[in-house]
Amino acid sequence: MKVSEKLLEQTGIIGEKIELGAFKYLSAAFVGSYIHAGNKIASLTGLSENFDKATEVSKNVSMQIAAMNPIALNEDGVSKEVIEKEIEIAKDQLRQEGKPEEMLENIAKGKMKKFFKENTLINQQYIKDSKQTVTDYINSEQQGLDITGFARVSLG
């Protein structure tokens, strides 16, 4: 069934016009999902393989995505523009704190490590166990497992 056909079908059921505001497609060996209470946030997680606990693991990672809203899977997924902007913000803050110019680059690199840890999915602290990263969690469930992609949609 096409998306347009499903929308038309649902319009007939609920009696109100439905408009599609966003559409995300994710292809992986296994794709799992999570819809947050209130149906305002939904997320998908692609895993590199299907295994016994794939549904549970992908739901937990999708919950992480809904809660923490990562901007990329890993450092390579963060655009050059975002990186440059964050470095400039860090340097400006350091200048305001009176740090010497020759130290700015090294301190900014440290701040970028923190930025990547907080904003890239595989490096984030796992919300159900802050002693682990998301990578640690998935590898504890299935050695060699990778997250191949993710998507997050929110209403409002």
Model features per residue range: what roles?
Residues M1-G156:
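N-terminal assembly/interaction segments in proteins that build large macromolecular machines
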